[in-house]
C-alpha cells in the first residue's frame, strides 16, 4: 500500500522547499519530490544556477569595477587588475553547494521526506515519482503542491547550444570570458550579466526590443542605468530586435532590426536573457482538470488551483517570477492547508531588485503606471550625489524616488 502524506510538494526550489518545511513545521506529514539531475537538486534554479551564483559573480564584478574606477581616488593603486573568471566561478559554485546542503539539513531537521525523481500527477491525490534509475513509485497525498519552476526561453534561430549561444546557466559556468558578447534582453537578468562580463573585460552589447533597459521599471531608472552602462563602455541598443545569427562565421554575425532598418553586430557569444517559461509539461495537469491561466497554473489568493487539494506556487503559478514571491506563496499554501492561514497573497506590493551596478530596487507603481491608473501623481526625489554613505562608498549614481497620490498623500 502506498504511503499517504498530508502534503506532497513537487519541486524543491525557493517556493517548494519553503512550502515543504513550513508544512512540516505545522505538523503535516510532508514529502518533497525533486529530480536531483535537474538544476542541481535542492534549491532549484535560484540556489544552483540562478540568483545565488549570479550574485556571487556580481560581487566579484563590483570589486573589479571599484578598483578600476575608484582605486586611485580611494588610495588603493593596484599596478594592474588581473581577471580570473574561473576563480570567481569556483567561488560561486562553493556558495551554491553550501546553501543546497543547508536545505538538506533543514529537511532532515523538520522531517520532510526528500523523494528523488520526477513527479507527475496521475489522479487527484496521487503523484507518480520516476527516478533516473529504477522503477516508479506512487505517493498518495491529501494535498499536492506544484512548485516546478520555469525554464529558459529562446527564439527560433537562437537555440541555446551551450557554446556560441548560451543561457544563464552556461553563463554562470563560463570560465574563460570571450572578447565580445551580445546580451539579448535587458531585463534584470540581462543587465546583471552585462554588468558581470563588462567588469571582467568583455566588450558587451546589450540588445533590447523595447525602448528602455529594465523596461518594466520606472522610465527614469532605465535612463539612469543606461547612462551608467555607457560610461563603463557598454553598447546599449534599445528598440532593437534580433533577426538572425550566422553561427558559422568567425566572429559570428548577428543581424538586428531597428526603426532605421537592418544592421549587423559582430560577436563571439550571444547570451539569451529573454525570460523564462513555466514548467508544466509532463505534470499531468490536463488529466486531472487543472485550469490554466495562459502558460501558468491558475490560482486564487490562497494559491489553490481549480481542483480541490491541488495548489501551485512560484514561477509555475504566474508573474512576477521572483524567488521571494514564490517563497511567500509557499508559506501561504502550507498555512492554508494546515488551517492556520490568516493573510492571503497580495501581488501589488512585491519588491523587485536588479543587483547590477548601480543597483535597482522597486516596489509598487511606477510614475507612468500611477498616471495611467488615474492618480494625481506627486513625485519626491533625492539624488544619491547628496547622500553621505553613497559618497563614502563611491556609489553615488542614482536616486531615491517616491511616487504618491497628491490628493491623499498615499505612497503608491
Q: Language-model segments: what does each one mean?
A:
Residues 6-32, 190-199:
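N-terminal Rossmann-like FAD-binding beta1-loop-alpha1 element of flavoenzymes
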Residues 158-177, 264-339:
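FAD-site-proximal beta/loop scaffold in flavoenzymes
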Residues 9, 182-183:
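Hydrophobic Val/Ile/Leu positions in short beta-strands of Rossmann-like dinucleotide-binding domains
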Residues 113-116, 120-134, 139, 200-301, ...:
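A Rossmann-like FAD-binding core segment of flavoenzymes
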Residues 2-5, 22-177, 205, 210-214, ...:
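Glycine-rich flavin
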Residues 1-17, 25, 218-220, 231, ...:
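Mid-to-C-terminal Rossmann-like scaffold of FAD/NAD(P)H-dependent oxidoreductases
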Amino acid at each position: 500500500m502506498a504511503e499517504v502524506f498530508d502534503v506532497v510538494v513537487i519541486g524543491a526550489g525557493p517556493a517548494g522547499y519553503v512550502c515543504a518545511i513550513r508544512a512540516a513545521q505545522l505538523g503535516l506529514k510532508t514529502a518533497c519530490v525533486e529530480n536531483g539531475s535537474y538544476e542541481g537538486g535542492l534549491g532549484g534554479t535560484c540556489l544552483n544556477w540562478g540568483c545565488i551564483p549570479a550574485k556571487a559573480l556580481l560581487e566579484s564584478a563590483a570589486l573589479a569595477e571599484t578598483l578600476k574606477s575608484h582605486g586611485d581616488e580611494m588610495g588603493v593603486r593596484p599596478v594592474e587588475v588581473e581577471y580570473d573568471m574561473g576563480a570567481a566561478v569556483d567561488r560561486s559554485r562553493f556558495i551554491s553547494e553550501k546553501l543546497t546542503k543547508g536545505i538538506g539539513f533543514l529537511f532532515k531537521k523538520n522531517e520532510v521526506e526528500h523523494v528523488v525523481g520526477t513527479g507527475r500527477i496521475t489522479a487527484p491525490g496521487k503523484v507518480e515519482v520516476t527516478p533516473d534509475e529504477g522503477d516508479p513509485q506512487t505517493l498518495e497525498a491529501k494535498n499536492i503542491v506544484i512548485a516546478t519552476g520555469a525554464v529558459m526561453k529562446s527564439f527560433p534561430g537562437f537555440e541555446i547550444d551551450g557554446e556560441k549561444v548560451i543561457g544563464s546557466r552556461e553563463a554562470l559556468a563560463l570560465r574563460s570570458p570571450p572578447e565580445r558578447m551580445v546580451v539579448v534582453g535587458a531585463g534584470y537578468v540581462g543587465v546583471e550579466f552585462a554588468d558581470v562580463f563588462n567588469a571582467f573585460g568583455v566588450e558587451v552589447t546589450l540588445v533590447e526590443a523595447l525602448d528602455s533597459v529594465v523596461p518594466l521599471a520606472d522610465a527614469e531608472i532605465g535612463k539612469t542605468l543606461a547612462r551608467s552602462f555607457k560610461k563603463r563602455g557598454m553598447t546599449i541598443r534599445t528598440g532593437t530586435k534580433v533577426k538572425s545569427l550566422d553561427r558559422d562565421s568567425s566572429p559570428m554575425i548577428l543581424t538586428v532590426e531597428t526603426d532605421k532598418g537592418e544592421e549587423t553586430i559582430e560577436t563571439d557569444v550571444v547570451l539569451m536573457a529573454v525570460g523564462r517559461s513555466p514548467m508544466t509539461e509532463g505534470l499531468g495537469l490536463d488529466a486531472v482538470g487543472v485550469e490554466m491561466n495562459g502558460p501558468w497554473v491558475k490560482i486564487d489568493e490562497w494559491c489553490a488551483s481549480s481542483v480541490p487539494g491541488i495548489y501551485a506556487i512560484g514561477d509555475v503559478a504566474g508573474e512576477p517570477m521572483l524567488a521571494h514571491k514564490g517563497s511567500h506563496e509557499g508559506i501561504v499554501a502550507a498555512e492554508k492547508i494546515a488551517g492556520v492561514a490568516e493573510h492571503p497573497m497580495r501581488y501589488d506590493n512585491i519588491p523587485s531588485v536588479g543587483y547590477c551596478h548601480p543597483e535597482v530596487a522597486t516596489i509598487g507603481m511606477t510614475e507612468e503606471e500611477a498616471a495611467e491608473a488615474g492618480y494625481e501623481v506627486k513625485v519626491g526625489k533625492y539624488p544619491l550625489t547628496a547622500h553621505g554613505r553613497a559618497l563614502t562608498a563611491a556609489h553615488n549614481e542614482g536616486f531615491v524616488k517616491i511616487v504618491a497620490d497628491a490628493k491623499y498623500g498615499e505612497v503608491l
